[in-house]
A protein has these predicted regions:
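Protein kinase glycine-rich loop
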Residues: 2-8, 13
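AlphaC helix of the eukaryotic protein kinase fold
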Residues: 31-54
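Activation-segment/catalytic-loop signature of the eukaryotic protein kinase fold
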Residues: 66
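Conserved short submotifs of the Hanks-type protein kinase catalytic core
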Residues: 70-84, 88
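Activation segment signature within eukaryotic-like protein kinase domains
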Residues: 103-104
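Protein kinase catalytic-loop region centered on the HRD/HxD motif
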Residues: 109-121
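Conserved activation segment of eukaryotic-like protein kinases, specifically the C-terminal portion
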Residues: 157-170
Length: 181
C-alpha cells in the first residue's frame, strides 16, 4: 500500500503496487457498516466484479480480485489516475464544448458496449463524480455498485437506485404531474 487516494461513506481506496509485476492497482477496502450484512455487501461486490471481470473496453475499469478477510472486503482493480469530472468542474468551471462532446462520445461507446454484452448490463449511476478524466484526456466510468445485468424475464424492477438529481425522476417518485407531456 502506497497511499490513501479516496474515501467514501463505506470505503477507503488505496493506491498499491504489485512488486512482482511493477504495476499499480487501486485497492478498495470496505468495512461492514452494521447497516448491511457482510453477506449482502459481498453479494453486491461479487455482482460488480462479475460484470467488470468480463469487460474489455478502454472506458471501463477491470476488477482483478476480491478478498474477504475478517469482515473486511478488499477489491483490487485498475488504478485510474486523474480527477473526476465533478472535481474538474469545481476547479475550473465549464469545460470547452469539444472536450465535453469527446467525453460524451467515449461514455456513449462504453454504455453501448455494456448494453451489447450477453446479458446486457445496465449502468444506473451516471453522474460527474463517477467519471474519471485520465491525464491523457480519456475518461473512465467508475462505480458499478448499482449496475445490473438485464433480465428479460424480470423487466419490472422497482428498486430505486442511483443518485437523486441524476437518476430519472420516476426512480424517486418525483415525476408525478411533471414534464411537458
Amino acid at each position: 500500500i502506497l497511499a490513501e487516494v479516496g474515501r467514501g461513506g463505506m470505503s477507503i481506496v488505496y493506491l498499491a503496487r504489485d512488486k512482482r509485476l511493477n504495476k499499480q492497482w487501486a485497492v478498495k477496502e470496505i468495512k461492514n457498516d452494521g447497516k448491511k450484512s457482510a453477506k449482502t455487501l459481498l453479494k453486491g461486490l461479487e455482482r460488480e466484479a462479475n460484470i467488470l471481470k468480463n469487460v474489455d473496453h478502454p472506458v471501463l475499469p477491470r476488477i482483478v480480485d476480491i478478498i474477504n478477510q475478517d469482515g473486511t472486503i478488499y477489491v483490487v482493480m485498475d488504478y485510474i489516475e486523474g480527477d473526476t469530472i465533478q472535481d474538474r468542474l469545481k476547479k475550473e468551471g465549464a469545460q470547452p464544448q469539444e472536450l465535453v462532446v469527446e467525453w460524451g462520445l467515449q461514455l456513449a461507446s462504453a454504455l453501448n458496449y455494456l448494453h451489447n454484452m450477453n446479458p446486457p448490463v445496465i449502468y444506473r449511476d451516471m453522474k460527474p463524480s463517477n467519471v474519471m478524466i485520465k491525464p491523457e484526456g480519456g475518461v473512465k466510468l467508475i462505480d458499478f455498485g448499482t449496475a445490473k445485468e438485464y433480465e428479460i424475464e424480470n423487466n419490472a424492477d422497482t428498486t430505486a437506485l442511483g443518485t437523486r438529481g441524476y437518476a430519472a425522476p420516476e426512480q424517486f417518485g418525483d415525476s408525478k404531474g411533471r414534464g411537458i407531456y
